[in-house]
Amino acid sequence: MKDLLNLFNQQRQTLDFDAIKIALASPDLIRSWSYGEVKKPETINYRTFKPERDGLFCAAIFGPIKDYECLCGKYKRMKHRGVVCEKCGTEVTLAKVRRERMGHIDLASPVAHIWFLKSLPSRIGLMLDMTLRDIERVLYFEAYVVTEPGLTPLERRQLLTEEQYLTARQEYNDDFDAAMGAEAVYELLRTIDLQSEMTRLREEIASTGSETKLKRLTKRIKLIEAFLESGNRPEWMVMTVLPVLPPDLRPLVPLDGGRFATSDLNDLYRRVINRNNRLRRLLELNAPDIIVRNEKRMLQESVDALLDNGRRGRAITGTNKRPLKSLADMIKGKQGRFRQNLLGKRVDYSGRSVITVGPYLKLHQCGLPKKMALELFKPFVFAKLQRRGLATTIKAAKKLVEREEAEVWDILEEVIREHPVLLNRAPTLHRLGIQAFEPVLIEGKAIQLHPLVCTAFNADFDGDQMAVHVPLSLEAQLEARALMMSTNNILSPANGEPIIVPSQDVVLGLYYMSRALENKKGEGMVFANTSEVKRAYDNRVVELHAKVKVRITQVDVEAGGKRSSGTSIVDTTVGRALLSEILPEGLPFQLANTEMTKKNISRLINSSYRLLGLKDTVVFADKLMYTGYAYATRAGVSIGIDDMLIPDEKKGILTEAEAEVLEIQEQYQSGLVTAGERYNKVVDIWSRTSERIAKAMMDTIGTEKVENAKGETIDQKSMNSLYIMADSGARGSQAQIRQLAGMRGLMARPDGSIIETPIKANFREGLNVQEYFNSTHGARKGLADTALKTANSGYLTRRLVDVAQDVVITEIDCGTTEGLIMTPIVEGGDVVEPLRERVLGRVVAEDVYLPGNDEEPIVTRNTLLDEAWVAKLEDASVQSVKVRSTISCESSFGVCARCYGRDLARGHQVNIGEAVGVIAAQSIGEPGTQLTMRTFHIGGAASRAAAVDNITVKTTGSVKFNNLKSVAHASGSLVAVSRSGELSVLDGHGRERERYKLPYGATITAKDGDAVKAGQSVANWDPHNHPIVSEVAGFIRFIDFVDGVTVIEKTDELTGLASREITDPKRRGAQAKELRPIVRIVDAKGNDLTIPNTDLPAQYLLPPRSIVNLQDGAAVGVGDVVAKIPQEASKTRDITGGLPRVADLFEARKPKDPAILAERSGIISFGKDTKGKQRLIIKDTDGSEHEELIPKYRQIIVFEGEHVTKGETVVDGEPSPQDILRLLGVEPLAAYLVKEIQDVYRLQGVKINDKHIEVITRQMLRKVEIVDQGNSKFLNGEQVERQRVIEENARLVKRNELPAKYDPVLLGITKASLATESFISAASFQETTRVLTEAAVRGTRDNLRGLKENVIVGRLIPAGTGLAYHAGRRKASGLTDSEMETLSGKPAAAEPVAAVADAGADEE
């Protein structure tokens, strides 16, 4: 019995470890694992099917084939356990030892390990400081290498050809050693003295000057350091002993018909053994050198193939021309060990079936077919049958169940009661793809799903299937109920808005019952309460849509739970009064006293959750659903072709458009417009026409004329079925109705460009052949896109999950005072996202004061901003708030709850242990399939919209300038002379309502603080010309203006005014190379004037194509335009949109022609140009200069003498995120990434909370680059985890030594995932071979901190309820061994359960 206990303990010990280390195996270690040498290539005897002795399946080496039975059958049964049979050499033990016992092959000649040879950078090459090419020549016997030069002039590691070798031998006899093949490499590696090599390299680094040499040296130093630290020896990279995998991991299975199916590994091993034995024989026979060499080369090749087939040369193929699967292939890729078996396991206890709708279910229920339930809950049913005494044995119980006796169903009912099951729909794109429900037994074979959870599962009932899983253990059931129950997941983790929102039929029903119509039966009646309304409605006294007055009782629930009620008479309709009956107590009636569109219903559910909590909201959502279905059925809404009303104006609008197009066509033929302009204008006309027809159509469908009670004819919203559906948000949108009843409009070609002939017909009129063809053209592209999109989106999600998987909330507060400053997001003057939405659910980083009052803070630091606080901020008209962010969080592992803020799916501060990284990745990846795949060509409407030439304010208020430099013009208006200036309009409370960019040279007619009215124009500029504005008053002097060389005189035919255009330097000829046309401003005496506040002369360098309208010597005032540069009609830069754009941002890719930013603050001047580049100089205030060479074709948007600040754009283009980080720092980079990514999602109408993007950004900024190593162990230019540097610096500061200085580095998500501290996580992501090679050389320890590593080693993850288990283990490791054993037996089961109970408590 004691033995048996020991046996179990033996199994248990392996589970208890804190880290995994990977290293090179030494020959002695390999021998110590081995249970014997495999000497023969034979596998099994074809007659007896018994393994051959000393073969690849030998029982003496690997263990018995049957449990407790030796091969020859002499010893059988347990009593002989541990005996080694003297006849056949087999140990009598369990057969499963054949899965763990290894063998070995003694190689007759050393063999280089291909991973360390060929996996770049080649480790053997770095170690020996030889090129891979050279080492391969030695290994494959093409050249000799000097291993020991002795006293000869030869160098160690020098290559010699056959002839050179013979000459050297004759010359120096035996004074030197040279060899070829792996022995030579082995010898070289063996004789390296790492310590002295290290010292030598460090000295060399100090003395070297060249960049490339430095790189090579630091690489070598790092490698040698790794070997010294890990205790690996370099010669172990060349193998002398080869381990043999246990036979049950490379099985040989007999098929029927006497053939065998075998693992490819057996073939590969057989090859190695054959060649090895042959080589051994040849060496014994003293065969000629050339034969031995050939055999050694073949041995090297066969071992290469075994380890990594196809890495070098052609892959070895089997009988069926298919490359054999080597050991490396076993672990890498989607089908490899990591991704197939360790990260994704299959589940028993599951069933799947088609889903149908279950409109009568409650939100926490699902309908489970009886047959399915019986099969899934079989063991529970068996147990219960036995306990009841209805069956004596399991076998009897089985019979009962198979016969499906009546009592079995009763017992099934009992078993199922309060035992939740998990429903999952593939693809599981976010955590709401698996939810728990209580099963309700139903007849039939389809699972019934509650309609309200369809949005979360993205399910519909056109044949979707779902899987059911049964949580078995008590802990699993508890977690399913407390955390995964559908009733606990009302809010979406992506944006914190309700995801349990009615859609389609339900919305239609609620909308229908809440519409108000004129002059319906019973209009104007007054009712005492809602039940009276109901009675009147049931007796057909009033109609559903009649406007009536009703006395409503309002119940207000205050924060303390006190209830107070009051009554009031409300103007409402019959339908809304009936709706008020299902409102929970405490929800104000005015929320429901509107038209119930999808948006309003969502708002209603949200308010209910915030005001009344979870339980009431769930009940309310269910009631809404039942009511919606009931009234949708009553409404009997249906659509026919007559509902698609075509507006009468359509014909007229089309005729107008056609005339316009014809006119442009004529202009084009007479050469007035270019082909591109013609195309753009035509597309423009048609998109405008399409809009006009759509508007006319919506007016036609959406309104109808009726008589009201007074007999007047008025317009009211129509009850057209088509319109109702779109207006309520039940199905369809304006864009789709436009195609049914307006005009189909412009179509896109598959490459995304727009076909200029639109489809003028709509679907009701029908398309003609050509229109139909154009229509299918675009539609087919759409379908092809969708298929590609799914794969791309999935891959993006995988990369995101991988980079963020180990971000977990680990503590409450890290104590940082850093944060991000949040302001409203403004686009084109409109506030797209007000401040309230951006700061909701965040924690304040520093006290917020009233604007202009620094005494009493409105909100103090570390307050979590909920809806009430945000309303307060809005009333105080605060414009910017500094909030805590995960990017600036200082927790050493994971992030802290304060920096993260509110858990969006629960509505309170996030719990410790929440896996926020994975949630962030899912929230960003899940809507990926809704994003577009195409790049937009700007043209037509888009470029028209770009040409804004003034600012007209939309609201009444006061003007405020931000960051604006301006000069006062003689006319009294201001002229902007900065690029980043902005103008805001504030309302009476000082709240920002609009914000606009002010371009350089804009004339501003309002002053700071002026009052403006809505519709007033406050600034204007010429969008087609970029002005150069004089900042001083004086007289013009032209310099280097040579007529016909640098300038051309032009006279305008219409006005007769003369102007000068600067020519292109390329066309000036050789003698004019040095000429640079400049306009200088001088005073009356002809002395140079300087630009205010600088010592630079007031002169403006004129770029090519600029136009000067003034004459030499003319007087200019401050703010006058000296010259102007025509802008090309809106650059047609393709903007990458949709998914590719998001991927580019997360991968931190540099754009093609990036914007050039100012490297420092200072004054701009231009130096001497080179052939294709112009030289831009920024002069600092302290006189130091920075030069930048810029290609001529790029447009420089700054002028000589202008002041720029560090990081300001100097040359237009898409900014590169690396530049933003380098010049402006982490916060602006975060702001940029968040803004750009949000823009893409916002365009598709997807809401994602900023903090998810911030979590990913934090992971992209994990690494830093060492700029100055100080006294640390890092090297200059090395990239290290930020955390390690911070720890090391803290250590150095304690000892009063110099800490290392570093700069943050931005890595793309793929790079960042591969650069994690955990090699297990990196290897299971991508490039498995490279990661493992690197890790083995370094002897890396994986501390199993992330989620992925723990999944792979088969433990609970250190997040959620698993965090308690890990904390328990850490505490426990301080205990004695015996106590440790009791713990490891049943890993602290009490703890996770307790944690779940707590979690459940704050759910309510």
From Swiss-Prot:
DNA-dependent RNA polymerase catalyzes the transcription of DNA into RNA using the four ribonucleoside triphosphates as substrates. Its EC number is 2.7.7.6. Keywords: DNA-directed RNA polymerase, Magnesium, Metal-binding, Nucleotidyltransferase, Transcription, Transferase, Zinc. It is an enzyme of class 2 (transferase). Zn(2+) 1 binds at C70, C72, C85, C88. SMART domains: RPOLA_N. This is DNA-directed RNA polymerase subunit beta'. GO terms for molecular function: DNA binding; DNA-directed RNA polymerase activity; magnesium ion binding; zinc ion binding.
